[in-house]
Every structure is written in C-alpha cells, then in structure tokens.
From Swiss-Prot:
Keyword Isomerase: no
Function: Putative regulatory subunit of protein phosphatase 6 (PP6) that may be involved in the recognition of phosphoprotein substrates.
Natural source organism: Mus musculus
Assembly notes: Protein phosphatase 6 (PP6) holoenzyme is proposed to be a heterotrimeric complex formed by the catalytic subunit, a SAPS domain-containing subunit (PP6R) and an ankyrin repeat-domain containing regulatory subunit (ARS). Interacts with PPP6R1.
Name assigned to this protein: Serine/threonine-protein phosphatase 6 regulatory ankyrin repeat subunit C
Keyword terms, alphabetized: ANK repeat, Phosphoprotein, Repeat
ANK repeat extents: 7-36, 40-69, 73-102, 106-135, 139-168, 172-201, 205-234, 238-267, 271-301, 305-334, 338-367, 371-400, 422-451, 455-484, 488-545, 549-579, 584-613, 617-646, 651-680, 687-716, 720-749, 753-782, 790-819, 822-852, 857-886, 890-920, 924-953, 960-989
InterPro entries assigned to the protein according to its UniProt record, in alphabetical order: Ankyrin_rpt, Ankyrin_rpt-contain_sf
Lineage: Eukaryota, Metazoa, Chordata, Craniata, Vertebrata
Modified residues annotated as Phosphoserine in this record: S1028, S1075
Pfam families: Ank (PF00023), Ank_2 (PF12796), Ank_4 (PF13637)
PROSITE patterns, sorted: ANK_REP_REGION (PS50297), ANK_REPEAT (PS50088)
Source domain of life: Eukaryota
Amino acid sequence: MGILSITDQPPLVQAIFSRDVEEVRSLLSQKENINVLDQERRTPLHAAAYVGDVPILQLLLMSGANVNAKDTLWLTPLHRAAASRNEKVLGLLLAHSADVNARDKLWQTPLHVAAANRATKCAEALAPLLSSLNVADRSGRSALHHAVHSGHLETVNLLLNKGASLNVCDKKERQPLHWAAFLGHLEVLKLLVARGADLSCKDRKGYGLLHTAAASGQIEVVKHLLRMGAEIDEPNAFGNTALHIACYLGQDAVAIELVNAGANVNQPNDKGFTPLHVAAVSTNGALCLELLVNNGADVNYQSKEGKSPLHMAAIHGRFTRSQILIQNGSEIDCADKFGNTPLHVAARYGHELLISTLMTNGADTARRGIHDMFPLHLAVLFGFSDCCRKLLSSGQLYSIVSSLSNEHVLSAGFDINTPDSLGRTCLHAAASGGNVECLNLLLSSGADLRRRDKFGRTPLHYAAANGSYQCAVTLVTAGAGVNEADCKGCSPLHYAAASDTYRRAEPHTASSHDAEEDELLKESRRKEAFFCLEFLLDNGADPSLRDRQGYTAVHYAAAYGNRQNLELLLEMSFNCLEDVESTVPVSPLHLAAYNGHCEALKTLAETLVNLDVRDHKGRTALFLATERGSTECVEVLTAHGASALIKERKRKWTPLHAAAASGHTDSLHLLIDSGERADITDVMDAYGQTPLMLAIMNGHVDCVHLLLEKGSTADAADLRGRTALHRGAVTGCEDCLAALLDHDAFVLCRDFKGRTPIHLASACGHTAVLRTLLQAALSTDPLDAGVDYSGYSPMHWASYTGHEDCLELLLEHSPFSYLEGNPFTPLHCAVINNQDSTTEMLLGALGAKIVNSRDAKGRTPLHAAAFADNVSGLRMLLQHQAEVNATDHTGRTALMTAAESGQTAAVEFLLYRGKADLTVLDENKNTALHLACSKGHEKCALMILAETQDLGLINATNSALQMPLHIAARNGLASVVQALLSRGATVLAVDEEGHTPALACAPNKDVADCLALILSTMKPFPPKDAVSPFSFSLLKNCGIAAAKTVGGCGALPHGASCPYSQERHGAIGLDGCYSE
C-alpha cells in the first residue's frame, strides 16, 4: 500500500502524529475508540510507538490500548518501537506486558528488528527477557545475522556478549560471517573472527567467504581473507573458485588481487570451464579476460563439451574479447564435441561482425559441425540473412580453370549443395528456418531446389511443414514440384496440413513477448500456415494423394487439429467424403477424436452422415474420445448423434465402459444424458461387466455415484456371478461400497463359487469394508451360514491370507463361526499358509477348542503345519497342547506327514522338540522312516536314524514285508543304506516278492529275478542242504520253466512260471497332497 494521507486518519492518530498530548487526552475523555484501525489494521498505539512520544504512549496504555495489537504484517507496537530505536518507549511497552516473543509475518521478533535497525539500547533491553538469542526468522536468520547485515559493530558486540551463537546458520546454511564478507563489513568480520568464527565456513552450495566477497567486489575483505590464509582456489559445489565468480560478475579489481595472490587461472569447474571461459561469456568480463590472458591463461583450454573460450565469446558475440583471444593464439577452428567451431556458434546466434572477424583470421567456412552442417546451414536455419550473405560472399566454392588442361581446380570455399549427415543442404535449412531472404540468397547462388535429403524430402517439404508461405511461394515459383513424395509417401501438402505441429519452436529469451503478444504471434503464424496450404492447393497440389500408410492431407489436418486447414481441404477435395469416411487405416474422425481436437471434430461431424464408423478394433470415434477423457469431443459427437452403445470387438466395451473404467465423469455424464436407451447404464461387455463394475474396480467414486443416480442396477452380476459389491470388497474402496449400500445392494449375493463380498473383503484384508459389510449382513439375514460352496467361511479366508485385523473383527462378530463349514478349520488354513499372526490370534482366542480339531481326513492343524514345514506354527501348536502323535484316518502322525513331504525343518523340530514317536505305524504298517525313504527324502531319513538305535524300528517291515533298507536301496539312497547297515539292518530279509534289499536295487522285477539267478549260480550250495529255504524263496518266482537248463545244470526245482505284475503292491499308498 502507498503512503497514506494523515488527514484521512482518525482524529486520535492525527493528534498522536502532531504530538499534542492535550488533544489526545481530550479525545480519550470523549470516548474516542482507542483501538481504532487504519487500512493496514494499525492502532493508535502503533503510531505512538513509531513517533516515540512517551507521555502520549502512557496515556494510551493507561486508557486500555491493546499492547500486543498486530497490523496486516503482524507487527506489534513493540516491533515499531524497536524499529524507531526508542529504548524509552520500548521499556514502557515491556512494563505493560508487551510480548517480547511476538513474530511478524516474516517470523521476526522485536530483537530481530532492533538488530536490523542498529537499535543497540533496545536490543540490550530485550536480550535478558528472551530464553534464546538464536531464534530464527522465516529465512532462518538470527538476530546476529541481522546485526551483521546492518554492519553495526556495537550491536554485534552486544549480542555476542549476551551469548548469541557465532556459527548459527540460516536456511541456506549461511553464517553471519558470509554477510559480513558479502557486504564488506570488514570490522564486523574481524570481530567475529576474533571471537572464534570459522573462516573456512561454507553455505549449502559450497560458497566460502572468499567467494561471497569476490561476488560483491569487496576488495578490502578479499585482501584481509587472503592475509588470513584463505584457500584461494577452493571450489564451491559447482567447482567454481573465487576467480570464476569475480570474472563472471565483472569484478576486475578482485580478479587482479586474486591473480596477483597466485590464483590458478586455468582451474576448471565441474563443467570444465576455466575463469577465461567465464570472462569470455559474461556481460562485464572484458577487463577480466584481458587480465587472465596477460597472466598465462590457456586460450585453447576446452571444457567437457569441447568448448574453448572463443566458443564462449561467439555465443554472445563478444567482438572485442574474441579479437583478444585470437591475437593471443586462440585456435580459430577449434571444434567442440559436436564438431562446431566458433564460426558455427557465431552463425547460429547471428553475430555478423564476429563472423567477419573469424573469417578474416582464416576460419574455415567449409568445416563440418553438428550433423556435418556448415556454418551456413546454421545461419539460414535460424534466419540470419546478414550472416548468410557474409558467409556466401566469402566462403562459397569457386574454381580456377587451368590454361593447360582446361580442368577446374578447387581453390577455396564450399559447395552450396553439400548435404549434412542427414542429406539436408543449406536450402533445406533455409526453407525450415522460414526466412525468405536467406532462401533467395541461396537460390541466386545456385542452390538445387530439387535436392532430397535421406528421408526423400525436398526444401518445399520443409517450408510446408513450417507453414512458411513466402518460402513456399519462392520455391514453387522457382520450379519445385508440389506433389513430390518423400520416403513415407508424404507430399508437401501432407506437411502443410499439419504445419503447426512441425513448426520449429522459437527459444524463449529474457525479452520474450508477454502472453497477449505470444497469442497474437501464434495467430499470425496460423494464418501464414493457412495461406501456405491454400497456395499449394492453388498450384496443383493433389489433396487425394495418400502416404504409404494410406493417409491423405485430410487425415493429417484432422490428426493435428488444424480446423482451418481441414475446412479448406474438405472444400477443395473432390472425393472428400470418401477420404473422411474411409477407415483404412483410420478415419480422420478417429484421429481428431483420439487427439482431442474438438474444433476439427466438429468440422468433420458436420460433414459426415455416419459418425459410428469403426476402426480395425471396432472402436468408434466416440469410444476413443471417451477413453482419452476429451469431454469437449464427447460433447461434439453426442450432440451430432454418435451412438454410445456400439461395442468394440475384443472386450465388447461401449464408450460408457471406457469412461467408467478411466474415471472420466464428465464424459460419462454426457453419454448417459444422450438418452439413447433407458437401461443404458446396465449395458454389459463380453464378461458381463457393467460400467458400474468397472468404475468400482478402478476406484472412481464420482463415476459410481453418477451411475447409481442415473439408475444403474447395483446387484447386476457378471458371467461369474460377481456383482459391483464383490468388486468393492476386493478394491477396498469404502466410498464406493457406501454408495452401493445406500442404493440397497444385496450384501449376501454369491458368485459362482458361493463367495459373498464378505469372503472377498476378508481375503483381501480390507477391515473397514468388512466391518461395514458385516453390519449390513446382520440387518439382511442374521442366520446366513456365511460359507461358500466349498464350505469355507470368511474366517477361513482371513486366517489363510494372514489378515489379523479382519480375523479379530470376525471373531468379535461371530466367535463360534469357526465351527461352521469345512472341517479344515481356520487354524488349519493359517498354519498351512505360514500365517503366524492369525495362528497366534486363533490359538489365543480359541485355544483347546481348536488346537486338536480334525478335518474330513482326520488331520489336525499339526499335520497341516508339518506338511507346510511351518516350524513357528508347530511351536505355537505344541505350546497350546497339540497332540504330537495324533494320527489321521490313514494312521499317520504329523512327523510321518513331514517325513513323506521332505520337510526337514518340521522333521527336526518334531523329533528334537516335540519328541514324536518314531514307532507309530500307518494303515500299511509304514513308519516315518519307511515314508521318508519311499519319497527319496534322504535328509529326513538320516535325521530319523540319528534319533534311534532300535533294531526293531530299523528292521520293521510294512504290509509288503519291506524294510526301510529295501525302500532306501530301491531309491538309491546310498547314505541312508550305509546308515541302516551300520545300525545292524539285516541284508537277508525278503519282502513278499522274495527279494532281499540287494535285489530291491533292481529297476524292475524281471531284472531282480535275473540277478537272483546269477547270484545263485555264482555261489555254490552248501553240501548238506543244496537248496536252502533262502535259495528256494529266491527262485520260486523267477518265472523260468523247469525244463530249461542253465549252463548245463539241471532244471531248477519249483521253477513254476509266475507272470510278473507291473504294479507293485500298495505298501505305501500315500496321497501326498494337502490341497483341498
């Protein structure tokens, strides 16, 4: 706010500023409002504190003035008194309980204000009343920062004596020393250093004291810091030294001092720039550059991008500095990593005078830069005609004819038609740049207007793409072909139709136009682009030409939203309707809708009869506009009669499905309001999903509310019987769920597996949703069993998935529901899926009621935990008195289950901690050792053997008379066989097929019989008993006829034929799977 007129203020304030005590007393006696506010909410007390009249202030305070009143800047009278340096007024305010900690909008206290305004006496009065002198304002500055900033030595000294911290930092980590150095308060700096301040301190960006002093040109501070031993070449966070800073800001006196003190003139920063680079580019760095050059700076030092100081001078056209650099040996054709020389840079930025200097000093005009461009390429690309003229006049190729051979001998310069790495000549660049003067200069110098680049484009293509009317006229007049196609089949007309898109963007500079001027410039360019297109059409450009994808210029205009261009093309094209309605590959209507160009879409909608044409995926333009969320395009299409019920081919989605799935509420509203069908909101896709279901699946609450308000059926089910409520339970969106329940959605609806939303909420762990559903279910059907078709309840699912919050809620809601449904209890589910949290909760809540419960196959939770190798589950179950040797219907204990499944951790725990009984037999008389060997679980078998020396267990036979040794041998468990033999396992025992453990190693019965014959022949019979019972049992089932002989021996006794059964006897008979 500006300066206020005193005559506009209340009489009381006028009397205060007049210092008229009697008038003030008179006004107060007349009940004048003592706390009246001005436009900035200042009270008379603020005015009195500012003026500093103690008697008036006493009158006001005695009359009840608000001592802590705040104005619009939150300044109190105490702040005003401190700013006025009036210690008597400040003392009087303090005596009347003024808040010494009051903060203004910058978080500054009265002490900050006193320090900033050199009010030493005020600061002295305030300091004892504060708990800390280091309180920071909004920028993190303490009172000491402000005192140092003001340069008042006495105040600084006072604050230090009162205990202010020397090294306190603001939010940019700047200490008071930084401000002393920056502002040149040398005496203050000396005082701070004498009190122990750190001379090597740095702020967040690594600026030290020497950097800050150099930045502001504080030469005396710089000299003092150097005398104090400051590191002269210390870099900041960007690698810049104090010399870099001085050169960048043109502080030549500081630069001289630093150089004389031995600063490294060639030290690079993080980007590889030396102080000379910085001096070359800075606004006021001319003297610094001369200083550096005279003191040995390397004029050819290249940055990380390969730029020399001459490159930097060329960027801003520093003519004098470039001359100094050249005179001191700067390489004239030094190339950066892009290949650009200083001449390229000068041409790019249009510095004609510098170009002259460089060329005079021998710069190579034919040197290739970025993309193999000449300097001339860059000059014409950016539209610098004077630079173009200069380069052409001094650098173009010329030749000398030899008088003897009559041959042309190259003398100097470059060929104007030489292409860059992408095949573009200077004429291509000029056409792209849009400067017709450059274009004319090149054409008059012999540039080939029919030359094509690597993409098959002529200069006319580039002129058309940039909407350059004058360049297009010049090129066509000179003979350029208007219908020539590039490698993609695009003619200049295609590019002109989309010219706003292809136009080269202008770089924004400090002197850029404001928004209004920018808009005028854009409008001017749009008009020029339109004239360019019109000119091409008038000069024979064929609008029916298609590119290699089948697109015409109409397609391009629609895709890039150029309404005027589109209207012109539709008007000029003889077969416009055929082009517009063609869906090969995509119609213009689809392109405009997909890209959200509503104006172009409106033009097409007014031209077409049928707006429901579909692309190869069956999508209409309305579908694309809806999917992309272009509400304006949706509005245009629906207003012109486009159907919202046409389905795409894959998922059979309509535009309504697309809008709901993407959350485009406004588009969805327009589609529903089109009134195409009464039940439009319940249209289904290929899976039976309605828009409401998709909106809920993606959590779009606004769409859900809209669909329900417009009549969408809340209980509609898809092909699997799942409703919107099922989906809300899965996603956990409480707002969506509440909306459905408000519209009477049925809570206990079941899908094809009998699962309700309550099941799904429990499985997904959405506690808040589950609570809401349970409350709704009570009012719907309190007697519903709540189990699915497999007998599983929500409690089963919560336990299985480990969602303890949901389980706790279910236990509170229905503590006996664990008895309902499948006998494979929630505890079974928790332990088999390694869910410790829900296991612990179930055991804590139900304990003995559930710990030994059995499923349909007689298995306890301990069996399930063993099967899943869940050691923590086993531990918790045993702690709650689970029966370690309980058997299922097949007679197996938890240990046997673990052994058969190969769960080594469970076997180890049950053996060592659970002390499980190893002698228990199942229905086929298998022990845990039999089962471990039968499945090849070597580690489990060895663990069991390590716990027993019982020969009865080691030689125990099952119903097929097989010992563990038989089974281990048959499965190739060498270490188990060795352990069994070392513990006394018999090798002569035979199973029901007459096989010893050795013969059990055979892969099948026939091999075993052959092996038995060979063994019987190799070992002679004892003399007293030629045919022992062992040999008889060994051979009785060999299957060889008695009449046959072996190796000349007689027929074997009892050699009756016995056909071998391919199926072994069911000695093991394990089901091996816990999956339900």
